[in-house]
């Protein structure tokens, strides 16, 4: 039986990321930010009231409300208020062709995100902001450094109750930005590629694998040489308003050449952005990749793809959660996260081609949940204690965390994999047989090998994301040419970054 988690983000904005720290900003030496707390800070009694604010209700609300009640029970005399703002998505479950399905349909709301950011800015200026902020839509480049976020370096260094090696350390290294750590993710995600061993010759496939990052351009070059018209190169549609598509993949891998948040200089008009748009359209028109649809049709298209796949693709892109299927597919259980913009393909001969890298070779991660502390909070001690509580193994194993990312906590990541496999195989008492245990151990080892390559968190700005996504719709809808879109984006981004 296959369990498909369908995420159809109708009109969903691509998560554009625009500034990468590839691990060169270290904690030690002259780069260390000034210490914000001393050792006495951690002896304070955990008490009083704090507020946690997030935009995305689906990712945060249930989890935070559970955490708030548990934290209050652990620390009598505390109160944790939870604020979330976006509408909850429509969730439907069912069965199709023997496959269990869960379809999550979200309406994108650029204006809602903009209103939320404006509200946060107003609250911060008036001194009435929350104590903790989820970093789901807030622009880190505007909030870090001299902005309203607390530098957490000294908290992690001086707190005797915080153990850095409890977490994936290369993720903690990657999030350092402007000589500081301004938020902590609770989880992490990455993309990886597979190749179909029935289509890609062994001599080529042997050069791919878990140890070596690779980007889409490299795989497209390989695929072009092999292409014979019988099968398409990638399982991604040319364009979709959902986060997955060939356009979104190439944009994310190359965004740093189009936009530099540190210098506040956009670069959409040197020809490379327009060339990328035209190449994606050409791939679709030439039949090299599937051609997509837009708008509300995405949801229906996704439902059609939830059945048993009938097509093969030279290469496929997946997120980290789907990696489980690589090791359970021969045991009668698979779990794929099928997102809008993805075409389902036969995967019985798939082998791992590598973790996805940016065009410059850096290997990024994303996160589902992450939090920063308001530097003007009146109760930083309790805010920090709550953030540590969210990072604990117990909370990272909560059933209210969406299973779309890997826990940052090392013990939680190990245990969550075990629980997921036991649940997938419906074993009584959570005991796996030898074959299932081998699959679990192979999966865990592969997760860690791929994760070892991560060295970059690429800072994003949702307002710029929405600008780019809006103009891309005009191009793929046929109402504007690539050069016109590039010029408009150059002007819009330049105006926004100069504010």
Can you describe what each PLM-predicted range is?
Residues 32-34, 109-117, 124, 135-190, ...:
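Hinge/lid segment of periplasmic solute-binding proteins
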Residues 63, 67, 378-390, 485:
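Short amphipathic alpha-helical coupling segments at ligand-binding clamshell hinges
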Residues 249, 253, 274-385:
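Extracytoplasmic/periplasmic substrate-binding proteins
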Residues 153-163, 172-245, 253-295, 375-381:
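Helix-loop-helix "hinge/cap" segment bordering the ligand-binding cleft or interdomain interface
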Residues 199, 231, 389-420:
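Periplasmic-binding protein-like
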Residues 20-142, 394, 480-499:
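Conserved N-terminal structural module of periplasmic/extracytoplasmic solute-binding proteins
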């Amino acid at each position: 039986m296959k369990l498909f988690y369908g995420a159809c983000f109708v009109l969903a904005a691509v998560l554009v990321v625009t500034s990468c720290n590839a691990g060169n900003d270290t904690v030690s030496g002259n780069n260390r930010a000034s210490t914000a707390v001393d050792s006495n800070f951690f002896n304070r009694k955990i008490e009083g009231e704090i507020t946690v604010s997030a935009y995305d209700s689906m990712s945060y609300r249930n989890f935070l409300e559970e955490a708030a009640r548990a934290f209050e029970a652990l620390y009598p005399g505390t109160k944790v208020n939870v604020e979330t703002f976006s509408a909850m998505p429509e969730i439907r479950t069912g069965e199709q062709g023997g496959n269990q399905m869960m379809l999550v349909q979200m309406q994108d709301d650029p204006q809602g995100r903009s209103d939320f950011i404006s509200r946060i800015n107003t609250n911060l200026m008036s001194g009435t902001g929350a104590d903790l902020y989820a970093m789901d839509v807030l622009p880190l480049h505007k909030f870090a450094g001299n902005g309203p976020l607390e530098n957490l370096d000294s908290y992690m260094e001086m707190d005797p109750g915080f153990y850095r090696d409890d977490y994936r350390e290369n993720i903690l290294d990657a999030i350092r930005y402007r000589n500081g750590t301004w938020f902590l993710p609770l989880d992490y995600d990455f993309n990886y590629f597979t190749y179909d061993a029935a289509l890609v010759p062994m001599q080529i496939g042997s050069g791919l694998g878990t140890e070596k990052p690779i980007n889409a351009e490299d795989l497209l070059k390989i695929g072009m040489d092999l292409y014979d018209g019988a099968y398409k190169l990638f399982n991604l549609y040319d364009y979709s308003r959902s986060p997955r598509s060939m356009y979104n993949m190439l944009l994310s891998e190359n965004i740093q050449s189009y936009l530099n948040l540190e210098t506040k200089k956009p670069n959409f008009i040197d020809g490379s952005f327009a060339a990328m748009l035209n190449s994606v359209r050409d791939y679709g028109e030439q039949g090299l990749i599937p051609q997509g649809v837009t708008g509300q049709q995405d949801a229906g298209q996704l439902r059609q793809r939830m059945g048993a796949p009938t097509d093969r693709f030279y290469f496929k892109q997946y997120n980290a959660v789907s990696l489980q299927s690589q090791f359970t597919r021969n045991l009668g259980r698979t779990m794929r996260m099928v997102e809008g913009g993805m075409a389902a393909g036969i995967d019985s001969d798939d082998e791992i081609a590598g973790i996805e890298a940016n065009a410059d070779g850096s290997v990024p991660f994303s996160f589902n949940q992450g939090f920063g502390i308001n530097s003007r909070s009146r109760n930083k001690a309790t805010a920090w204690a709550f953030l540590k509580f969210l990072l604990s193994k117990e909370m990272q194993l909560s059933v209210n965390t969406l299973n779309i990312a890997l826990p940052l906590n090392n013990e939680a990541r190990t245990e969550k994999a075990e629980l997921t496999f036991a649940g997938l195989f419906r074993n009584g008492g959570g005991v796996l047989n030898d074959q299932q245990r081998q699959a679990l151990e192979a999966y865990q080892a592969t997760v860690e090998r791929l994760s070892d390559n991560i060295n970059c968190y690429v800072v994003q700005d949702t307002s710029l994301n929405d600008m780019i996504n809006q103009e891309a719709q005009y191009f793929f809808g046929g109402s504007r040419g690539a050069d016109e879109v590039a010029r408009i984006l150059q002007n819009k981004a330049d105006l926004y970054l100069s504010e």
